Amino acid sequence: DNPHYQPWRDRIEQELEAVDEAVILVGHSFGGSVVLKYLAEGSYQKPLRGLFLVSVPNWGPDGWAYEEFAVPHDVGLRLPASRIFLYHSRDDPEVPFAHLGYYEERLPAATARPIDGSEHSFLRGLPALVDDIKTLPR
């Protein structure tokens, strides 16, 4: 597999163009990093109710060092107004827990939820995420 950003970006944009109301976006792992980069580009101008990022890798030079998927250093200043939540297992076997710290620094208004355990995919669910979605204004 050799994924590239542009096809994923185009698909996200296509799906979001079809929605006329404020959306809640949930991005997991690679998908979360693509959604975050897309939003940071600034082309999405519709209301965003919430952004929920789960186990998102840092593609920057102090992470996995793959520039094509790296978000800008000032990503927190580029995002549409919205509540942002970050979730990451302390012992994630796929994406190191330190990647959460990277996003905490760049998204200071975000609420970080470190999760005890070694989940990456959260196959049994992520109750904290569900609870946080329920707190969003309608």
Describe these PLM feature segments:
Residues V26-L36:
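Gly/Ala-rich beta-loop-alpha elbow adjacent to hydrolase catalytic centers
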Residues D1-E21:
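Active-site catalytic motif of lipid deacylating hydrolases and related acyltransferases
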Residues K37-G50, W59:
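Conserved hydrolase catalytic core segment
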Residues P93-H99:
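Conserved alpha/beta-hydrolase "acid-adjacent" motif
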Residues P3, S118-V130:
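Catalytic histidine-centered segment of alpha/beta-hydrolase-like enzymes
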Residues P80, F85-H88, D92:
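Short beta-strand/loop motif that positions the catalytic acidic residue
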